[in-house]
């Protein structure tokens, strides 16, 4: 007899259970786990934000924010609803993008592995849109708002 957390078990039963456990420990879907371990979407999102920031440096941050940032007056009067999405990928300064991307790199791989690529992408985009809508609702009409902070806070909320 072998002492076990649930009492005593015979040696043959323990050996048989161990053999069955070793036989069934393979992956259910071969190769899928390896693909999910690569945080592709996280790196793509960081890349999009970085390229948008570098382009805005070349053209002028104020110009890019003026044309694509979340400005309630343009959404309310001109119906430029695309600004709610484009503002998520724009940033004011190197510190702004740096801290947002740092947190995205810290949280993204874990959440992407848990949720999968598609649901992680939807989480990021919908949380970013939610942040932009909140900014739209609570900001003065002439204020410009940009950044992935709403999406980042959505990712933090998903960890809870």
Per-range role (PLM):
Residues 3-41:
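Cytosolic juxtamembrane regions of integral membrane proteins
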């Amino acid at each position: 007899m072998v002492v076990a957390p649930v009492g005593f078990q015979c040696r043959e039963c323990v050996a048989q259970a161990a053999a069955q456990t070793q036989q069934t420990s393979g992956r259910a879907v071969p190769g899928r786990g390896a693909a999910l371990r690569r945080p592709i979407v996280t790196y793509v999102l960081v890349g999009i934000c970085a390229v948008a920031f570098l382009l805005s440096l070349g053209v002028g941050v104020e110009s890019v924010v003026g044309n694509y940032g979340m400005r309630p007056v343009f959404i309310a009067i001109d119906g430029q609803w695309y600004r709610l999405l484009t503002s998520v990928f724009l940033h004011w300064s190197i510190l702004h993008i740096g801290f947002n991307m740092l947190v995205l790199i810290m949280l993204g791989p874990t959440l992407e592995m848990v949720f999968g690529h598609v649901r992680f992408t939807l989480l990021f985009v919908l949380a970013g849109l939610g942040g932009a809508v909140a900014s739209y609702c609570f900001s003065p009409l002439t204020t410009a708002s940009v950044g992935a902070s709403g999406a980042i806070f959505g990712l933090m909320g998903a960890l809870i």
